[in-house]
């Protein structure tokens, strides 16, 4: 049986008790179900107040029935909403009544899946519904809404159209080699290609910010032993999450703490102090610390501002720079300002990193600077007119597209291989298509929609 032609039903409101609860139906039986349950023919897009009845004609509840005939509905099919009282027993009775008239219970995300299959939403917009529901901050909610309204999809479609235009130009040059002008070598292809790469880079950067807002930023606290890393973690967490002693090497393993700053999710990782050691257990901790540094979205490199080596903290541990070469992802924390007498403050350094001077022992001003800085790193200060939500799979697809464009450019400039460039352009277009669902496997769609709420 084609499950898309079945009529599905589910409770669309959150679990628990509330003033109003909604049962939603979608499919060819929606109009008939509305007639059987309400005892009247429902006028499209009108609110009908009255009783909801069972098979015997007994009243289950009283509420409002709304009928939306397809294709002018959320799913593109006939849709019925029964809005009654929000008690779980009442809603379950109403849902069972829908099953009696021929509906089946909907799978998680099946309403959004049908909207996608009926071209009412693309895949990025469908995912934005779940992101909007799960948003943990006002900025994340605004970004998700912009993705739902199609902002992210428009950017991807624009890139796709530019790739298609470039593919047409390149493949025409390949198909007509007898032309006197070598169109692949006239500079126009490289100009078009570099323009697409520049726009793709911009979308990548903005998508990365959107993913941080949605998934949270991983912040690794690193530094020498006794620099105050664990004290800083405790201040950010607002509790004694880590043991703090004067003994060097107290922290020997990774310690993770999930916190929120004004609704912004952060995954904070405290690490073992970076130093050479003969202690086998501590050495493993240092190795794990370096691995965490390489995987972090942001690194807080904590130094003791009273120590002599604080004048050149990046020279303390060469392996640190090997794992984190981009200074723009590093925030230098000059800790123990209460002992060194250094003024609390924030400085943007010439090489791209930020330095914050503070005391991890209750320095409210310095900790406020750090919190605001971390929020800014996550895109908290974006305006409502910029930004969109994105997921890790979107970032992977954008990276794949970028890699294909880089490879194709190299094939053209080094070998003059137009055919290989054309193939890389096709692969880049395919990668972008995975974002909106233009090219997506059934397995991928199943994984995405199964993570949605039932009734969405």
Curated annotation (Swiss-Prot):
Keyword tRNA processing belongs to the record: yes
GO cellular component: cytosol
Subcellular localization: Cytoplasm
InterPro entries per UniProt: G_TrmE (IPR031168), GTP-bd (IPR006073), GTP-bd_TrmE_N (IPR018948), GTPase_MnmE (IPR004520), MnmE_dom2 (IPR027368), MnmE_helical (IPR025867), P-loop_NTPase (IPR027417), Small_GTP-bd (IPR005225)
Enzyme Commission (EC) number: 3.6.-.-
Binding site for Mg(2+): 230, 251
Keywords tagged on the record: Cytoplasm, GTP-binding, Hydrolase, Magnesium, Metal-binding, Nucleotide-binding, Potassium, tRNA processing
Occurrences of domain TrmE-type G (ranges): 216-379
Binding-site residues for K(+), renumbered to this chain: 226, 245, 247, 250
Biological processes, Gene Ontology terms: tRNA methylation; tRNA wobble uridine modification
Positions annotated to bind GTP: 226-231, 245-251, 270-273, 335-338
Principal location class: cytoplasm
CDD domains (alphabetical): trmE, TrmE_N
Top-level taxon of origin: Bacteria
Family, as annotated: Belongs to the TRAFAC class TrmE-Era-EngA-EngB-Septin-like GTPase superfamily. TrmE GTPase family.
UniProt function note: Exhibits a very high intrinsic GTPase hydrolysis rate. Involved in the addition of a carboxymethylaminomethyl (cmnm) group at the wobble position (U34) of certain tRNAs, forming tRNA-cmnm(5)s(2)U34.
Name of the protein this chain belongs to: tRNA modification GTPase MnmE
């Amino acid at each position: 049986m084609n499950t898309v032609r079945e009529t599905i039903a589910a409770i669309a409101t959150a679990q628990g008790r509330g003033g109003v609860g909604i049962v939603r139906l979608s499919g060819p039986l929606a109009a008939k179900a509305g007639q059987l349950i309400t005892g009247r023919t429902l006028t499209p897009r009108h609110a009908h107040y009255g009783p909801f009845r069972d098979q015997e004609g007994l009243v289950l509840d009283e509420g409002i029935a709304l009928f939306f005939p397809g294709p002018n509905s959320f799913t593109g099919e006939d849709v019925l909403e029964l809005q009654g009282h929000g008690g779980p027993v009442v809603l379950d009775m109403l849902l069972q009544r829908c099953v009696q008239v021929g509906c089946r219970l909907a799978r998680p995300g099946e309403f959004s899946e049908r909207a996608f299959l009926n071209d009412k939403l693309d895949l990025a917009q469908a995912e934005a519904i779940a992101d909007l529901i799960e948003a943990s901050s006002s900025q994340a909610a605004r970004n998700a809404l912009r993705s739902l309204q199609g902002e992210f999809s428009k950017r991807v479609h624009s890139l796709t159209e530019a790739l298609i235009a470039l593919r047409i130009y390149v493949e025409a040059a390949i198909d007509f080699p007898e032309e006197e002008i070598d169109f692949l070598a006239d500079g126009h292809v490289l100009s078009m290609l570099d323009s697409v790469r520049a726009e793709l880079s911009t979308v990548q950067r903005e998508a990365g910010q959107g993913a941080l807002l949605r998934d949270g930023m991983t912040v690794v606290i690193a530094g020498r032993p006794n620099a105050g890393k664990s004290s800083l973690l405790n201040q950010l967490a607002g509790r004694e999450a880590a043991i703090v002693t004067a003994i060097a090497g107290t922290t020997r393993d990774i310690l993770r703490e999930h916190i929120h700053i004004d609704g912004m999710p952060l995954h904070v990782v405290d690490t073992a102090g970076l130093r050479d050691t003969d202690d086998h257990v501590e050495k493993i901790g240092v190795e794990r610390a370096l691995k965490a540094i390489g995987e972090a979205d942001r690194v807080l490199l904590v130094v003791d501002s009273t120590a002599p080596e604080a004048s050149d903290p990046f020279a303390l541990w060469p392996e640190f720079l090997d794992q984190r070469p981009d200074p723009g992802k590093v925030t230098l924390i000059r800790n123990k300002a209460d002992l060194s007498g250094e003024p609390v403050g924030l400085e943007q350094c010439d090489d791209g990193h930020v330095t914050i001077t503070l005391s991890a022992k209750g320095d409210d001003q310095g900790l406020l600077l750090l919190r605001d800085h971390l929020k800014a790193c996550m895109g908290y200060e974006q305006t409502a007119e910029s930004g969109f939500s994105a997921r890790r799979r979107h970032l992977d697809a954008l990276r794949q597209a970028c890699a294909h464009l880089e490879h194709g450019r190299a094939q053209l400039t080094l070998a003059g291989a137009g055919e290989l460039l054309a193939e890389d352009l096709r692969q880049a277009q395919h990668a972008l298509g995975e974002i909106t669902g233009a090219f997506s496997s059934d397995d991928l769609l199943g994984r995405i929609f199964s993570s949605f709420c039932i009734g969405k």
